[in-house]
Amino acid sequence: MRRLLAVIAAVAFTACANDDLVIVFDTTTTSPATSAPSTTSAVTTSPSITTTTIAGYGDQVRSVMVDGEALPAFVDSHSDPAIGRPIPTLTGEGYDGTPITIGPDRTNPMLLVVLAHWCPHCNNEIPEINAIRDADRWPDGLEVVGISSAIAPDRPNFPPARWLVEKDWTYPVLADGIDETRGVYIAGDALGVTGYPFMVLVDATGAVRGRWSGESPADALVALVTDLINPPADV
């Protein structure tokens, strides 16, 4: 544990806040998604869901359903009450309309990466993640899944679907939705997101191993994920 805390402390986390976004609630409903199911093992296909569009957002926000208890809002990696808890099941779709379900019923560890298109730290972090991908440095069996959240039409790099392509993000990505009643981004809220980029590391049993917010270099990110998935013995 001492080494894990040292690794976390060594990572320079700098994040974008999400507490100043304005969400518009003029909604219309479109037909259920009919795209082919995903073939990526990090996610499972879900039944067709009704897609909700919001004025000004186009098709960049999608309907997301949550099953299970939401994780508490993130405050501190060192004393995070979410550690050991199962993630809730998130059912939605990608920007290509592919139905996606992310949940605790799994066989491999998973890193969830919540991104905001307008966040400079997200723009800095994606190349670091891509470098890890290209060098095949992730721990064996780790699956990486993105969540596009905090969508804001009046901010840079909108629409996020195009931004992700431009950034060479090749992992599956769930498009977040908006809860009209509470004024929150559904998937982000269910995971306790308080800044961007936000990461949730889940083990092969579906339990949270770690959460953190902010950008970090590739070497530090690999070390953190590896040590949390395969904890070293204390010395």
Where are each of the predicted segments found?
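N-terminal targeting signals for export/organelle localization
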Residues: 1-89, 234-235
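Short loop/turn microsegments at loop-to-beta-strand junctions
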Residues: 87-88, 109-110, 196-197
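Short active-site neighborhood of thiol/selenol oxidoreductases, capturing the structured segment around
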Residues: 100-123, 129
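Hydrophobic beta-strand positions
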Residues: 91-92, 201
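Thiol/disulfide oxidoreductase modules built on the thioredoxin-like
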Residues: 167-169, 176-230
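Hydrophobic beta-strand anchors of alpha/beta hydrolase catalytic cores
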Residues: 111-112, 144, 199
